[in-house]
């Protein structure tokens, strides 16, 4: 027919172009009907992944056909008229009718066999033509009507078989698509579940790590606090000892002063007594005479007085030496105490610096964890989210 626009090929027709030629070359004696059956079985055995390129090619051909023929509309041929002469379908009309009856589905992803069954219908029409146009005697009208009914019944049965085969194949394809969708949906759920478990494990591990760091940091702070308390106690004890030493030194010095004052009073008392004795000696000539008469006593008294003075000087010198020694010890203790305070101050500054560094590290780790958790969560959401599969 001139001006007739063919419909675009579906996925099976795209696939069967090369396969039909190969099968015909391998089996030259095989009929076209048998070739179509084998091609249908082979197409049915292919997986969805193997069929996907042919579905894509069929979709591309459909788009090109729509662009080339924008006003195209499928219009099936009308039902063929019965010949007035013989009462049977003409061969070309029968072939066209069979082709039109086999136009099942317009979905580009559905498996149809229009081209193959049109060829089979054409072969069928040629066989019928060779049969109907043989020179035989014209039977009676009843016999012709019976033959026509048989032919129509055979054609109807053949069409029903093809329709059943197509329906069965459509059901199998729908079941496969549903199984594939269910499998993909199950895989997506499993991936999302695995990703969620990984995030939970990462979060638990990081939380445990943070708790351990916090516990260690708390222990370090407690140790630092205990160390400070110990140092404070030591300082207090040293201060108390120093105060006791000062008190002892003060008591000792006070005692020495009292002792010196007492000795001085004794010396004054002795000197006063000695003066009184001299006055008495001057006032009593008899005693003076006795004193002159006894020069040895005077010498003894003078020697005794000199010994007393030497003893007093030695005692004073010894006390001065003792005071100097005590003063030197106090200076040494004060110097040692000052060094201990300086060491404690330096140690305290070092601990404060370490604590600040630990706090800064802990803050940086928290910031890194928050950034990592945000990026990982965003990637997980982007990876897991997507269109939900169609319901079965």
Curated annotation (Swiss-Prot):
Pfam families: HMG_box. The keyword Cytoplasm applies. Expressed in gonadal somatic pre-Sertoli cells. Expressed in the substantia nigra of the brain (at protein level). Expressed in diencephalon, cortex, the substantia nigra of the midbrain and the medial mammillary bodies of the hypothalamus of male, but not female. Residues 52-84 are annotated as: Sufficient for interaction with EP300. Signal peptide: none annotated. Residues 142-361 are annotated as: Disordered. One of its GO terms (molecular function) is DNA binding. It is found in: Nucleus speckle; Cytoplasm; Nucleus. Keywords: Acetylation, Activator, ADP-ribosylation, Calmodulin-binding, Cytoplasm, Differentiation, DNA-binding, Nucleus, Repressor, Sexual differentiation, Transcription, Transcription regulation. Changing residue 133 to L: In strain: Torino. Residues 94-138 are annotated as: Necessary for interaction with SLC9A3R2 and nuclear accumulation of SLC9A3R2. Residues 4-81 are annotated as: Sufficient for interaction with KPNB1. Transcriptional regulator that controls a genetic switch in male development. It is necessary and sufficient for initiating male sex determination by directing the development of supporting cell precursors (pre-Sertoli cells) as Sertoli rather than granulosa cells. Involved in different aspects of gene regulation including promoter activation or repression. Binds to the DNA consensus sequence 5'-[AT]AACAA[AT]-3'. SRY HMG box recognizes DNA by partial intercalation in the minor groove and promotes DNA bending. Also involved in pre-mRNA splicing. Interacts with KPNB1, ZNF208 isoform KRAB-O, PARP1 and SLC9A3R2. The interaction with KPNB1 is sensitive to dissociation by Ran in the GTP-bound form. Interaction with PARP1 impaired its DNA-binding activity. Interacts with CALM, EP300, HDAC3 and WT1. The interaction with EP300 modulates its DNA-binding activity. This is Sex-determining region Y protein. It comes from Mus musculus (Mouse). The lineage of its organism: Eukaryota, Metazoa, Chordata, Craniata, Vertebrata.
